[in-house]
Regions:
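Conserved alpha-helical scaffold segments that buttress catalytic/binding sites
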Residues: 2-216
């Protein structure tokens, strides 16, 4: 049937057939162990009593992509990718509110599956992810917030995990890059920046903020 829809459909069907299900099966087993087997009336015995995984998308604690929450940040090196929120909007010039960005991103991410039909890749099967929660930002002090974010990112990077930061306003780009750079021993760090503006001012309204991160 997929032949009549063209090569993209053919690729999607064939790629999906080759996907491993190891992580999916491990998540089911973990859910049954930690969340108790489902009630006797539940016919699908893969469903636990307490939600302990990706499903259902409308339930559970809000982490990015329903990844496991890791309270002990010293253990983040056990994962390929570590998510950390940076709820800070003290670097905005005009419109506040992005401090609630990490909450919003986590909430909406629960509605999305991990499989890309275009790429033939299942994120949950390809890498291991965890969510470390949020960096303790300082609303009244942008420089102290930068220090906090840089330390958090540096810790994750040094552990061997890849840090993904959920902001937060644009000023946090500086703190994020600085956190990675601390581990490069003078090596080069590339930046791919998508924005309407280049954000390379020295200062804005006499401060380092959302229009200045790449100057510094």
């Amino acid at each position: 049937m997929h032949d009549k829809y063209g090569p993209e459909a053919k690729f999607a069907v064939e790629a999906e057939a080759l996907l491993p299900t190891t992580k999916h099966e491990e998540e089911i087993a973990r859910g049954l162990e930690l969340g108790l087997p489902g009630a006797d009336s539940i016919k699908d015995r893969r469903i636990p009593t307490f939600s302990r995984g990706e499903l259902p998308h409308f339930a559970g604690i809000n982490t990015f992509g329903k990844a496991p929450y890791v309270e002990d940040v010293r253990k983040c090196g056990q994962y390929d990718v570590a998510i950390l929120g940076a709820p800070f909007d003290g670097g905005t010039t005009y419109r506040a509110g992005t401090r609630f960005g990490p909450q919003g991103i986590r909430k909406i991410s629960a509605l999305y599956g991990s499989y890309s039909f275009e790429l033939g890749v299942d994120l949950r099967e390809s890498i291991s992810m965890c969510d470390l929660g949020d960096v303790f930002t300082i609303p009244a002090n942008i420089e102290k917030t930068f220090d906090q974010v840089s330390k958090g990112v540096s810790h994750v990077y040094a552990s061997g995990a890849f840090p993904v930061v959920l902001g937060g306003d644009h000023s946090l780009g500086f703190a994020t890059v600085r956190g990675v750079a601390k581990n490069l021993n003078g090596g080069k760090l590339g930046i791919i920046h998508f924005d309407r503006h280049v954000d390379t001012q020295d200062t804005d309204l006499d401060e380092r903020m959302h229009t200045t991160p790449w100057f510094h």
